[in-house]
Each structure stands twice: as C-alpha cells, then as structure tokens.
C-alpha cells in the first residue's frame, strides 16, 4: 500500500512548462514558409512557359524545391537519416492519433489526421530542403538557424519539466534524447556545409564541379559486369556467410537509410510508451488486489474463496513478470527484421538487375506503373507502422507463450508437483512420437514395398511406378480410417503453425504471409514490390551508365562545335575509325564473355562457325 500511494503521489505531480513543442509546432510554420520562399526564389526554373504580364517580374525564379529525391539519392544519407530522426516524436503522435489540431466529428477524423500530417511535414520541410539545396551557403545558414531553434526549444522543454508522471525522474529526457541527438547532428552538418561553401563564395577555392548522374558504386558494378569473373580469394568468414557481406558495388539509397533510422527511433519510443502503459496498468492491478483482499476478508469468513484469491494473484504476478521479460526478445526480433529487410532489399535488387523475377509471385512480375509510383511514397511510412504493430503483436504472442510455459513447467515445480508434470509431459511426448513414427512408417513401407526398383545405380530415388498393386490397395483401405483421425490433428497443427508464422512474420513487409494466389490482398507486400520496381527502373547501374554516356557524349559534341577551328585541332592527331573501334570493343567483349557468341544473330554469307568454336573452346579451358 505504501508503494502504491507513493506512485500515486508521483503520478499526481504536474509541471507547468512555458515552452511546449506542440504549440511551437504551429508557430514554426511561419519561419518554415519563409525559408521555403527564400530557397524557392533562389531555385531557377529550367523550363519556362511563355511569360505574361503577371509573371514577368518573377523571371525564372521560384522553382520547385525538392526536399529529398526518394529514388536516386545516395549522398548525405546519414544527414537525411538525422532529419528523419528529428521527426520521430511527431510521427509517434500521428501513429497514436494523438496529434489532432482540430476538433471535428468522428467521421471526419481521417481528414484531420491528413491535415495534421501535412502540418508536421511542412514544419520539418526546411531540414530536408536545406540539405538538398544547391545554394549551400544560404541553405546552411537557414538550416543551422532553424535547427538551432528546434534544439533550444527541445532543451528548454527538457530542462523545465525533466520528470514525468509514469517513469518519474528524467522521463522527458528519455522521450526526447533521440530527437535531440538528431538535431545536434544536423547542427554539425549545416556548420560543415557553411565552412565548405564560404571559401567557394569568397573565391578562395574553385567551385565544385557539377555532380554526375552516375554514382561511383554504379560505375564499379558495370565494370564488374564487363570484366572476367575472378576466382574467390580465400574462404568467407562466418559473419560473411551467415550474417552480411559488404559489397562495394552496391549502396542503399537515402530513403532506405532514413527509414531504417526513423524505424529504430520510433521502435524505441514505442517500447518506452508501452512500458509507461504497463506501469499504469500494474498500479491499477495492485490496487485491485488490495481491494479484492479487503473485500474477501470482510465477506468470506469461512475461507472458501482463499484458493481463488491466491490463483488470481498468481496469475497477475506471472503475467506481469512474463510481460517485462518478453520486452527484450520482442524488441530484438524487430531489430533483426530491420537489418534483414536491408539484406533482402539488396538481394532482390540484384536479382532484378540480372533479370530474375522467379522469386516474385506470378501476378507481381508486371505490377501497375501507377501503383508502383504510389508504393514509393507509401513504403517508408508503412514499413515503420508494420514494425511497430509487429512488435506489439509479437510481444503479446511471446507473453502468451511465456504464461503457458510458466503454468506448464515452472509453477508445477514451485508447487512441488514436478513429478506429475514430468509424467504428463512424458505421456504427451510419447503420444506425439508414436503418431510421427506411424507417419514415417507409412512412407517407409510405401517406398520399400510399393515402388519398382531404380532404373540405374546413379538414380537418387525410385521411379514413381507402382509395384505389388494388390497389397497396395489393401494398404490404402485399412489406413483410410486411421488417416481420418490423423487428419484432424494435421488440420489443427496447420492452423497453429499458420498462426504462429503469421504473427511472427507480421512485421516483415518484404515477404507475404498470404497463401499462394492471395498475395494481392497483402498491401504491404504490394508496396514493397512496387518500390523495388521503381528503384530497379530508375537506378539500374547499366541503364544509368548508358544514359550517362549519352549525356556526356552529347555535351562533348556540343563543346566541339563551339570550339573555333575544331577541324584543325582534330586533324592534328591520329584519326581513328569509329567502326573499327566498335568492332575492337565487340571483340574484347566476346573474348571476356565467350558465351555471348551463341546469342548473336548470324548474317547470311558470313560464317563465323570457326570463330565461335574457338571462343567456346577458350571458355571451357
């Protein structure tokens, strides 16, 4: 009772904070819009329509600002991840439907949540816009000022009200330290951008060259495809074989890194909130136990209900202990899923680059283009929601399994009924072993007596040809009635395994938990497939390299035309035939990849059989 009253006194403690992040979020829209207008004014419009009188004064200013290229951005990945992480607290408020700027009827809650999401996105838009802007000097100053403002507001909120109602001391710090860390990282990033852009603006350093559309890892991937496969040097370690192997020819886009970091922070906040709810429920249960004891003390003088009281108290105690213990395995399961999703993303992308779609269900081989474009916007948010809901469901299932384990194994030993428990456990294991043994025996009898012998000594199994047909028909007849009973258990085991796998893999958006033929009902898996195809079509290294060659060659030709007396300059050096150079490159490619000769079209009158045979012979050597 004393502990309960102490906790009650701690819950009743209130704090008047003059700085509220929720209220500041509304006022932050004003500087956010100002920063957006400044960056939009600096952004030039590349394609302008014919100007009229109303837009004459604007010129080619006020271009569209891109906060983040969700498809092809591979630089500043951790900076974008920190910007996503700074929004974690607001994302959790949106997830719990606790952030509603307006009070409307129940049927209009969806519109209110949409407006709230737009307000949160607009408030944090300057972080992303300043990171992606080409005008680094101005954007670094604006981004640093805006990040510093949010940093100061967060520090003031933590310092004014550090303690809370549920966790007690430093509760506010427990909730807001991830956002504070991300804001500090952004401050350092914007300061670094300012120190790099200032010498360029003052003319002390040359201006950086225009960024190429071909990333370094994409060029390495194409070079690896065009080169001969090298023999593997040494054996792979256990970590490389079982966990992860780093690939220098592959990089995760900024969207995936930001989603991963935001999912980690949201999962942490979700666990903290869940623990706060658990503390509140535990206090209520303690008060319920005290009231139950006092009530039964006055009403139950004979003591007939005492065993029921003890069982209820034992159930409450076991449930509370199991719930706390299973927090760690449930959290580790979801953390493992996050890393595994990255590994699956790389594996699936490489298969799509190689033209392999066999790992996808048949109906997802050609997804809708519109649905794929929407999927690239849905994926990040859905991935976080799947992880949070998956953690809660996994935690509940693990808690139920823990309670069953306690009542099945631990509590009988505590109550000195271990021998009875072992007897029941032994009978259950024996029954299950007999059933499984009969199933295996049926397979052995069928393979030994009812199949014809192997056709060759190298065959792995007997052919599917019946032998001893009369005995086989009697075998089927007498086992028919037993298999009816066996099918009941098989049906229940199918249901149990499906439930366990479904709940265990609910957070895995990279694979469907639906049956074959019903994968289209899994919207999360559809978003994953659509996102993969968008990335495949827009970041394929071979396609990007081809476009890069076209763009650079086009620029070179335009530059050659602008140079005066370019004919004289070109005649000064040796002249090469473009056709001969192309044939030389073709020969080099065929020598490195002799199997490609079989895929070439043969022209009439040009027999290349000897050359093909030579290349194929070289490939076999």
Curated annotation (Swiss-Prot):
Please provide the record's keywords in A-Z order.
Cell membrane, Glycoprotein, Membrane, Phosphoprotein, Receptor, Transmembrane, Transmembrane helix, Transport
Q: How is it modified after translation?
A: Glycosylated.
Question: Which compartment or compartments is the protein found in?
Answer: Cell membrane
Q: Could you tell me what induces this protein?
A: Induced in adipose tissue after high fat diet. Down-regulated by holo-RBP4, retinol and retinoic acid.
Q: Which GO terms describe its cellular component?
A: plasma membrane
Give a GO molecular function annotation for the protein. retinol transmembrane transporter activity
- Give the matching InterPro entries: STRA6-like
Q: Which domain of life is it from?
A: Eukaryota
One GO biological process this protein is involved in is: vitamin A import into cell
Residues modified as Phosphothreonine are 612
Organs and tissues of expression: Highly expressed in liver and small intestine. Also expressed in spleen, kidney, colon, stomach, placenta, adipose tissue and isolated adipocytes.
How is it placed in the membrane, per its record? Multi-pass membrane protein
Please give the start and end residues of each transmembrane region: 22-42, 54-74, 111-131, 138-158, 174-194, 259-279, 322-342, 384-404, 425-445, 477-497
Where would one find the signal peptide in this protein?
A: none
Extracellular face of the membrane: 1-21, 75-110, 159-173, 280-321, 405-424, 498-621
**Glycosylated residue positions:** 12
Cytoplasmic side of membrane = 43-53, 132-137, 195-258, 343-383, 446-476
Q: What does this protein do?
A: Acts as a high-affinity cell-surface receptor for retinol-binding protein RBP4 and mediates RBP4-dependent retinol uptake in the liver.
Protein name as catalogued: Stimulated by retinoic acid gene 6 protein-like
